[in-house]
Amino acid sequence: MRRIKVGVKLFETNTPGHYLLGTPKYFIRISTLAEKALALEIAKGRSDSEIFQEPGVDHEALEKIFSELEALQLIDSRESSLKVSQRFISKVEERVEKSKKGFVDAALLQLQSRALPELNQSRWISGVQDGGINSLTSRQNHLIEISGQNRVATILYSLLLLSGFSQVRFAPESRNRKPQIGDGDIGVIGIGPSEIGKSFRNHCESLRKEFSLFPLDRDHNYLDELSTPELRVHCGDSDPEKLSHWMSTSQNFLLIPNPQGDIAEIGPLVIPGKSPCMRCLLLVARDQNRAQQHLDLGASREVEYPHIAAHFIAAMAASFIANFFDSHIQDNQSQELVGTVVTVDYQSLSRPRSIVIPRHPLCGCAFQQLTEK
């Protein structure tokens, strides 16, 4: 069964009788009346087998169109359905059976409704042929730990929950200096003045059930400190000892350092032994005579992101994290932030800049993978 992906459309061109079938990114040309008739049926969402059964259909022309669309990854060729993590399988199967008998399960309908916008992203991942369902479903199995005390960390937490990463959590040491909700938290993930003074950690956990795309297990401890995250995300200035520990224990991590003036940064995403590390970044900056670490002049004012920039940075970071895990599911290595730092100017958010970091020959991380082999 082959069917076009949701979002593929038939476009007119300036040349009479000529059309484009696809998206603004990828498309095929339709230049005859016979092809147009077939393209209209395909654009309606009908499968190849359904159209083949129509009398008088040119099978060769139809196969040609589907083959061209498939080559551009504009076709879904596998049927799939949303699944929740293994601990819920029996519950969901029971709900599905009830729905077949005419019962309406509000929770299942809500999951399907909330998942549709997320599928508008995951179905277009390179190599996906099932409408993006497998990639979206797999997100709930990944453990992500966020550390940091700024707005970006808080917004990122909510975005990941809403995008299917049910197991995202804050590190135990997060908000140690600011355990209560304060004035700076107002407006972030629905926090209002009435929440000031409440426990930030407890508030975020109370939102987990409300924000999580997938259902949660009441018996599961999502704050289990003994479980090792698949990705650590640190927002703010980093501790060299902690980075060294993550490197030596082969823990993947993403850094979102504090902004410098009106310039924010995201990255790099470090895969120990397989990608450039933080020392590579410092050595490359030194070789290029760029500014490196700022001087420690004692007590300094804590710099918080403005709201607009905080949401922008958090959204970009969430996109990079989703790409990191979705790429693993599809066995491609297109992780965007590996070996890259993205800088964002508050005055021109629409023009972020990517800085590629190569592995530096003087950094020992290049030899870690060799020693592991």
Report each predicted region and the residues it spans.
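Adenine nucleotide-associated cytosolic modules
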Residues: M1-K373
